């Protein structure tokens, strides 16, 4: 495992503490929610090419394993994530289903990959959390062969994704200590500006860059909604320390705020994303 330093420590601490365990616990719900995006990533790597594929920010391995199943014996998939709780789940899933994928617990920004080891890189919401995105994208470029394909999905703006901010907006008046999103830093909407993404990729050794909007219709069971917003996101960080009365008031208020998204047994929302494609340029940046 890489040992992160400086600002990288913050992400390592975050994803190896209760946040990481919460995401591991919610794995079935999250995999179901984001299943509509899975095909977009898998289509980037066809069975006719096979080869070695890297899944960045792989979490509990859902996309990595799906791709490994599609490629079969002619390919090999490697997932990398900074979170030990998530990688532990991913490895257990691979072993349980007998899928030949492997997983690395490390920070993809600083991990020393074998040069030109991969034929493609994919990521589902895994590239927005780097401390230094340019450094991370250059490191990924060094890990792939020339002309290798990069495809990732990232969130567009918070304004275009009201479902994702409903909980914190509803809870903010009741929780003065609720962590605010940091503008310009690592986080869910760090790649919301397509011009910034294009600039980062072009400066990190990637070419043939294409960025297009994708709106995915996502769902989760209504029965999982309260667990979803109390375990994940800003509320998941502060509610464990709240007294019972405050917690009940927050849960009631936030649950009501989600009513526009609830349709009987399902919660439905649109994930407004960017689908980003690029090819590794002929020369690794120095």
Question: Where are the regions a protein language model picked out?
Answer:
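Conserved Class I S-adenosyl-L-methionine
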Residues: 2-4, 14, 19, 26, ...
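A generic alpha-to-beta junction signature in SAM-dependent methyltransferases
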Residues: 45-47, 71, 144
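Conserved catalytic/acceptor-binding region of the Class I
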Residues: 134-135, 141, 145, 149-220
